[in-house]
Each structure stands twice: as structure tokens, then as C-alpha cells.
């Protein structure tokens, strides 16, 4: 134990050194080690949200998780099953009992991210050291390998934007170490534990690591080391059994992570992918690019064929060379991303291979002849300096390249053993310094670029662009003036996780995974248009009054320049550039109704809104909706400008100012309705690009067809009203071809909403409890109690203490049947099969212990 602590102390020191530039920039310039996009928009808000819920004992369900939902399952891609984060939360809770910590403050979580990165890097170096020491039998070289891998540019890139990505720097070396230990010592315990932890930690990277582990096992079984003691066939069987046991051990967490993926709605990637990528500054992995930089020594080590006689040197030389070639094949990016859109997230494997290869080169290079060393070194340096000349880019670490090379050469030239040993240590230190300089330059050029410095700093996070004192004060004012079950429609610019870090019940969420019920509701049932198309977000209600009232939105806050205000919101407060509007036709979040409509009878979004206002919508139950709104498209005049029809529903825009399709509405129609819903199918043609659909003063920015983040939903609904001339103007830009199919134009006079508002019972409401809600019912008839929170399988309902049936209504909401005298509804949530998975995991853990004991006893008998 003492030895472990010593090494952890060494690696903690090295980690501080590796983070020294980051710490300096934070203290001196206030620059954060958290990215300006996903970092402060996703990672920090999600961590704050999880801490807020867990610290009060709410583990699974919350109504303020966007529109509400199972945050434990849906955030398993991020942090809800992340072992390091769970330990981090427990430590913070413990510290809060001793000292005052402002966990509501953003800066605390920004600093926490840096502290955790330092600790994580220390653990990662220790795990890499264990593997390196096992295969090299050299402590000094193993420390160098660990530093080269963990303190490489990719670790910083992962950590600054997606901190859970860099967990692989711990798990991959530990996995490979457990495999080697199994093959050479027949000890399966660590392998089973490692598989268990990997599966628990993150289901997405469990897939990566399973591919890596399976590939490594196959390689090591095919190409055996002289110290391997398990026969090939037996090794395959025992590894398979161990992996299954590890999976079983993890099911109490892993199962729910997989459920989040299966419940997600994501369009299959259908874009074109090149067979190969060309070599340029972005793909040259030996020079300063945005993703990964391998030291020039990697090239030199690959060229030293004589050293291939050593088993692990040969293994990692082949792996390094193979993965260098594969880095130019986009299909590999798709393979590691589950055969979806290509994502460059697997390059940590290449970084690891390179680090191990350089370490082994350092161990064996003294057996080279001077000529071999010089030839391989000169070729490596030519590649590096040729890159600098080609890209017209000088980076500071180039100065160290010839110095490192010269030290290595001196070791070969000098005959005195004492000098050679001392120079060998200096050579190792010089490689560490080179790696450090490469990483610092990478951080400066590829992470701390202009946008990062401007948007990821201590000033920005307290400004009006992210979270100012005035914003938080106004949010508190709205919070104190509404009921607990009412919502606030507000977000800072494009910060869709504003509700998470300003602590209110909002309407928006930015996450990679959503339960499909919510997206089905947004995309299909009501066709709520997102101003900025993205598969990873939902936001607001596109100014649609009916939906605002259905979700009990009490207040909306807008900046001076923002518009798209719902029809019956009135201004109640102005402060600086902000205005607060109150919903004058709000509805309670809970209602009891006898009216049930069959979803199959509803054909348009406006009819679905009216059905929800009058009653509830169910699948395969209820009566037909008898009051459909008429399509007004046949009653409008249409004109075009800068746009030419080139086929059925195909148009071409030219002129550089956008093409317009103008719909003129007769006065009698304009006088009859307050708002209009325009439904159209719109898709970009050639040339493919991002494009904008502007409906009068509202701009909808949509993604190019090949975009990874495109929703794949081409039929859009725009709430609008005519200008002073009675026109609804559709403007398409930029120039090029579009597919446009105008499908519906419906008018809305809000008579249905007004009637629902007048008849509403505002004495009925809910308040949040741990993992659920409690509804207090006032006077009502028997019927269905509809509650505007997302339904999830795993909910249990109790009416006045007695179990009751619970089901989905309104495409995503929750309902419970109640009798006339019912007073209270309690809804509790636990992820489906929670107890079952815990039981299976416990049984699997017992079997794992028995399996390891049997294997160990057989091994002892073999020794006798």
C-alpha cells in the first residue's frame, strides 16, 4: 500500500506539471479549462443539476429536467453512472458538512473540473504505469510511458470539452493490464472487476473498450508471448466467461445506460463518407493539428526494424503503424461510433500505442548502431520540419526535436558506461519535456484559441451572455411569483440548459439523448419548430400560445431584440434589456376530464392542440375528434420573387438576396384569426449547405443534409401572422435548389383555449417529491387526471394511498383515472427492472467470486 501511495504521489506531481500551463492561464487570465460550447453549455450544467438532485436524495426523476423525465437514465451517457463523478459528488457532500462550499455557483464547478482533471490524470498515469511495468519490467521507462500517454494533447482535448471521454485514459490501460495479467499469471479477478467498472462507468465508451479488449485478446492469443501459460482455446473460453460475468455484475447500471440509447430517437446517418481522407494540416498527426500530435520519435521507432525482435516492441510497432493508416479511413470513425456518423473519438488508442512504442524504443535503442539511429532519426526529422515548411507554421517544440535527437546520439557514441546511464535519464527527461511542450502548444493553439478565451473565462460566465446577476434576480422574482408546478420560458441566447444552472423549471434542454416520447411530441404530434435545428436540443414552444398554456408556462422573459411572443402574454415587468411577460390564459398543470380522443382521428397539429385543451388524447382509445380546422391554403394568393419553379415542388433561388414565396390572405380571413399555422415540407437541394427559412420576422436556421446533428424532420410548422399588407412571406436562402411543399395553413382564434381557461380548476396542482410528484385534487368529477409531466415506464400511481393504473396521454404526458371523491395522487418513479437488475448483479458477483476461486484453486493444484 505504501508503494502505491508513493507512485500516486509521483503521478500527482507529474499531473500538476502537466496542468501547469492551464493553472497559470486560469490564475493569470481567468481562462477556464472548460470549453465554450459543450463544456459550459452541457457538461457543467448537467453536473450541477445531478448534484442538486442527488444531494437531496432525488435519484431518478425530476419535472425540471427540461420538460421533465428520468434524468438518471437519460444522462447515463454523461455522468449519472460515471464512477469518478459519483465519487466526486460524495466528496463534495462530505466537504459541505465540514466547510462552506457554494455549489450553486458556476465558478465552483469550473474549478472542480480542473481539480478532477488533475486527479484523473494521476490515476490514469498509475494505471498506464501498471501495464507498462508489466511488459517492460523497467520502472523509469514505465513512468515515461505513462506520462507520454496521459499528458498527451488528446487528453486535454477530451477533458476540456467532454470530461467523461477522458475516463478511457484510466480504463484502457487497466483493461490491457488485466488481460496480460490473466494470460501470464492466470488471474481473472482484475479482468472481471475492470469489465464491471467499464460497463458501469459509461455504456458508450464500454463499446469502444470492448472492441479494444476483444481485439487485443485475439491478437495476444494468436501471437503468444513466451510467458503465456494458458492455452489458446482455454483462454478464449475463460475470457468469454469472465466478460459475461463482468457484464452481469454491471447490469444494475449498464442496463439503464443501454435503455437510454434504445429509447432515444436518432435519425440513421445517411450522408456520404469518403473512402480516404487526404493528408493536410488537419490529418497530419505528427504536426500541430486540432486532434492529436504524435512525437517524431514514433516515426523513428517504427523505422528501427532491428528492434522488432522484441515481442512487445514488434506488437506495438505494428499496431501503431496500422492505426496511423486507419486514421485516414473514415469508416473506422464510423465503426467506433456504432456505424453512425464518423466521429474521431478513438484516437486515444493511437496515442497509447505511440507512447508504449516510444517507451520501448527508449529501453532498447542502445542496441542500435549509430548509422541505424541516424538514418531513422533524419527521416523522422525531415517529416516534421517538412510539415512546418509546407504549412508555413513554426511551433515552439520544434526547437527541442534536434536537442532530443542529439542526446540519444551521444548515448550511442559515448563508451563510458556511467555517462551513458546519466545521459539515458537525461534522454528520458528530454522526451518528457518535449511531450510537455507539444501539449502546451496544442493547448495554446487548438484549445485556447480566440473563441475559447473570449467565451470560456471567469468574466463571461457572470455576464449577460451566460448568467448575470440581473438575470438570476429576475428569475428569482418570477420563481417567487408562480406556483411550483408552473414553468418559466427563458434561456440565455442559445444556452438551452439555462434552467439547470439558473435553477428554475423551464422548457429547454441540451443533451445528446432524449426519450423518444418527447421528440415524438415535438417533431411529429405538434411539430414545434426549433429556431436552430439540432438533434441535441429542444427549446421553448415557437410562440404557440396553446402549448404554453398546456405546459402551464406562467412567465416568459425576453431580451429587447427578441420576439415571437405568444398571443396572450402581457408585459408585467421591465428591467434593463429584459422584459417579463405573464400568460393571461394559463392552464393548471393537472386537470380531470371525461373527454378522451383517439389519436388516429387527429390529422393536424392544431387539431391535436384543441383536443388536448378539451380533454386528453390516447392511442387506440377514445372517440373521434369532430371539429377539425379547415385548410386555408386554397383561399390565399401566391406570388414569387427571385425563385423559379423547376419541377414538382422543386424551386431554385437566385439573385443572392433570397427567394420569396408570398401568401396574401384576404381581409375576412385575417379578421377572423389571431394567428396562423403554416405547415410545409422543406428540404435543401444542390448545392447542399445550411439554409434559412424566414417566415415574416421569424428565422429558422436549418442544417445541411449531411449534417450529423440534423433532425431528419423536413415537415415544419411555423406559427405566424400576416404583416400590415396581409402577407405571409416565406424567404429561402442562400441561392440554390429547394424542395418546398406547402401543406396546411390553419387559423387560430383561441376560442378553445379561452373556454378551457374559463372552465379550469386552478385549485388542483402538483408539487415535487423525491422521484415523483404529489397532486392535490380539489372538487372534480370522476374521470382521467391528466398531468403535464412526461410519462415513463416505471411510474407507479397511488390515489388516496391505493395503487392505481397509470398510462400515457397526449403523446408524452401522464394520466391516472380518479373517482369523484379522490383527494390526492402520488406518482413515484423507479427505472424499469431496477430491482431485477440489482438482483442479477448480486448473483453475478457471487458467481464471479466462485469462478475466480475455482480458477485459483486449479492453478495451485497445477503448481503442486
Tell where the protein language model's regions lie, with residue ranges.
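Start-transfer (signal-anchor) and selected internal transmembrane alpha helices
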Residues: 1-26, 427-428, 846-864
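Membrane-interface coil-to-helix junctions
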Residues: 15-124, 150-159, 163-169, 263-266, ...
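Periplasmic/ER-lumenal interhelical loops and adjacent helix-loop junctions
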Residues: 41, 45-50, 83, 89, ...
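Active-site-proximal, structured, solvent-exposed surfaces of multi-pass membrane proteins
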Residues: 47, 634-864
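Extracytoplasmic/lumenal acceptor-recognition loop(s) of multi-pass membrane glycoenzymes
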Residues: 74-79, 434-458, 479-547, 587, ...
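A cross-kingdom signal targeting lumenal/periplasmic-facing segments of multi-pass membrane
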Residues: 84, 126, 502-610, 614-635, ...
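Membrane-embedded helix bundles of polyisoprenyl
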Residues: 116-134, 140-183, 187-224, 235-258, ...
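Contiguous transmembrane helix-bundle modules in multi-pass membrane proteins
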Residues: 205, 318-324, 337-463, 822-823, ...
Amino acid at each position: 500500500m505504501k508503494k502505491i501511495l508513493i507512485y500516486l504521489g509521483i503521478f500527482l506531481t507529474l499531473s500538476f506539471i502537466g496542468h501547469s500551463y492551464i493553472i497559470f492561464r486560469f490564475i493569470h487570465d481567468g481562462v477556464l479549462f472548460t470549453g465554450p460550447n459543450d463544456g459550459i453549455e452541457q457538461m457543467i450544467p448537467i453536473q450541477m443539476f445531478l448534484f442538486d438532485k442527488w444531494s437531496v436524495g432525488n435519484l431518478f426523476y425530476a419535472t425540471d429536467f427540461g420538460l421533465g423525465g428520468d434524468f438518471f437514465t437519460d444522462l447515463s451517457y454523461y455522468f449519472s453512472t460515471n464512477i469518478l463523478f459519483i465519487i466526486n459528488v460524495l466528496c463534495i457532500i462530505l466537504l459541505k458538512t465540514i466547510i462552506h462550499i457554494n455549489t450553486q455557483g458556476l465558478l465552483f464547478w469550473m474549478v472542480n473540473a480542473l481539480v478532477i482533471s488533475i486527479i484523473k490524470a494521476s490515476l490514469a498515469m498509475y494505471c498506464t504505469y501498471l501495464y507498462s511495468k508489466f511488459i517492460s519490467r523497467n520502472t523509469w521507462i514505465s513512468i515515461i510511458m505513462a506520462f507520454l500517454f496521459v499528458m498527451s494533447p488528446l487528453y486535454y482535448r477530451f477533458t476540456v470539452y467532454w470530461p467523461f471521454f477522458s475516463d478511457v485514459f484510466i480504463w484502457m490501460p487497466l483493461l490491457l493490464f488485466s488481460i496480460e495479467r490473466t494470460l501470464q499469471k492466470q488471474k481473472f479477478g482484475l479482468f472481471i472487476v475492470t469489465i464491471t467498472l467499464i460497463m458501469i462507468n459509461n455504456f458508450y465508451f464500454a463499446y469502444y473498450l470492448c472492441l479494444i479488449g476483444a481485439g487485443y485478446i485475439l491478437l495476444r492469443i494468436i501471437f503468444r508471448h513466451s510467458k503465456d501459460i494458458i492455452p489458446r482455446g482455454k483462454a478464449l473460453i475463460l475470457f468469454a466467461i469472465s466478460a459475461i460475468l463482468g457484464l452481469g455484475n454491471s447490469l444494475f447500471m449498464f442496463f439503464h445506460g443501454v435503455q437510454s440509447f434504445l429509447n432515444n430517437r436518432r435519425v440513421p446517418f445517411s450522408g456520404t463518407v469518403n473512402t480516404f481522407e487526404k493528408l493536410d494540416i488537419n490529418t497530419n498527426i505528427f504536426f500541430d493539428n486540432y486532434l492529436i500530435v504524435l512525437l517524431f520519435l514514433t516515426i523513428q521507432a517504427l523505422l528501427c526494424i532491428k528492434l522488432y525482435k522484441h515481442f512487445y516492441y514488434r506488437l506495438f510497432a505494428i499496431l501503431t503503424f496500422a492505426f496511423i493508416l486507419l486514421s485516414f479511413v473514415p469508416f473506422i470513425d464510423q465503426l467506433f461510433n456504432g456505424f453512425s456518423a464518423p466521429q474521431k473519438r478513438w484516437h486515444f488508442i493511437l496515442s497509447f500505442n505511440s507512447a508504449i512504442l516510444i517507451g520501448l524504443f527508449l529501453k532498447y535503442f542502445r542496441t542500435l548502431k549509430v548509422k541505424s539511429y541516424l538514418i531513422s532519426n533524419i527521416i523522422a526529422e525531415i517529416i516534421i520540419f517538412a510539415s512546418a515548411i509546407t504549412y508555413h507554421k513554426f511551433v515552439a517544440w520544434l526547437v527541442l526535436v534536434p536537442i532530443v535527437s542529439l542526446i540519444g546520439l551521444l548515448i550511442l557514441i559515448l563508451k563510458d558506461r556511467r555517462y551513458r546511464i546519466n545521459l539515458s535519464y537525461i534522454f528520458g527527461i528530454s522526451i518528457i519535456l518535449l511531450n510537455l511542450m507539444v501539449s502546451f502548444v496544442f493547448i495554446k493553439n487548438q484549445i485556447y484559441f480566440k473563441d475559447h478565451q473570449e467565451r470560456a473565462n471567469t468574466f463571461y460566465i457572470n455576464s449577460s451572455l451566460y448568467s448575470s446577476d440581473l438575470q438570476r434576480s429576475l428569475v428569482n422574482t418570477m420563481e417567487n411569483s408562480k406556483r411550483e408546478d408552473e414553468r418559466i420560458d427563458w434561456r440565455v441566447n442559445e444556452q438551452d440548459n439555462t434552467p439547470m444552472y439558473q435553477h428554475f423549471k423551464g422548457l429547454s434542454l441540451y443533451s445528446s439523448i432524449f426519450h423518444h416520447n418527447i421528440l415524438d411530441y415535438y417533431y411529429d404530434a405538434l411539430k414545434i419548430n426549433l429556431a436552430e435545428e439540432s438533434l441535441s436540443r429542444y427549446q421553448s414552444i415557437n410562440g404557440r400560445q396553446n402549448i404554453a398554456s398546456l405546459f402551464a408556462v406562467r412567465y416568459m422573459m425576453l431580451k429587447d431584440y427578441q420576439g415571437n411572443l405568444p398571443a396572450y402574454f402581457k408585459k408585467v415587468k421591465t428591467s434593463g434589456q429584459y422584459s417579463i411577460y405573464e400568460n393571461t390564459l394559463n392552464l393548471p398543470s393537472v386537470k380531470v376530464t371525461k373527454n378522451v380522443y383517439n389519436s388516429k382521428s387527429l390529422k393536424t397539429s392544431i387539431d391535436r392542440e384543441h383536443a388536448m385543451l378539451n380533454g386528453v388524447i390516447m392511442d387506440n382509445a377514445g372517440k373521434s375528434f369532430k371539429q377539425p380546422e379547415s385548410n386555408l391554403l386554397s383561399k390565399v394568393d401566391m406570388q414569387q420573387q427571385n425563385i423559379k419553379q423547376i419541377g414538382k415542388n422543386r424551386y431554385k433561388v437566385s439573385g443572392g438576396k433570397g427567394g420569396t414565396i408570398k401568401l396574401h390572405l384576404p381581409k375576412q380571413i385575417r379578421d377572423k384569426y389571431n394567428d396562423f399555422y403554416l405547415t410545409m415540407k422543406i428540404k435543401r437541394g444542390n448545392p447542399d449547405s445550411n439554409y434559412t427559412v424566414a417566415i415574416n420576422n421569424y428565422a429558422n436556421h436549418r442544417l445541411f443534409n449531411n449534417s450529423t446533428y440534423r433532425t431528419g424532420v423536413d415537415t415544419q410548422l411555423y406559427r405566424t401572422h400576416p404583416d400590415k399588407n396581409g402577407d405571409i412571406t416565406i424567404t429561402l436562402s442562400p441561392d440554390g435548389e429547394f424542395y418546398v411543399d406547402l401543406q396546411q395553413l390553419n387559423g387560430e382564434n383561441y376560442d378553445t383555449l379561452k373556454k378551457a381557461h374559463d372552465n379550469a380548476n386552478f385549485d388542483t396542482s402538483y408539487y415535487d417529491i423525491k422521484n415523483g410528484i404529489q397532486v392535490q385534487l380539489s372538487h372534480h368529477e370522476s374521470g382521467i387526471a391528466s398531468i403535464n409531466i412526461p410519462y415513463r415506464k416505471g411510474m407507479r400511481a397511488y390515489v388516496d394511498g391505493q395503487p392505481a393504473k397509470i398510462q400515457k396521454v397526449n403523446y408524452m404526458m401522464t394520466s391516472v383515472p380518479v373517482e369523484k371523491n379522490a383527494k390526492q395522487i402520488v406518482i413515484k418513479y423507479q427505472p424499469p427492472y431496477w430491482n431485477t437488475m440489482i438482483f442479477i448483479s448480486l448473483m453475478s458477483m457471487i458467481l464471479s467470486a466462485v469462478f475466480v476461486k475455482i480458477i485459483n484453486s486449479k492453478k495451485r493444484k497445477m503448481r503442486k
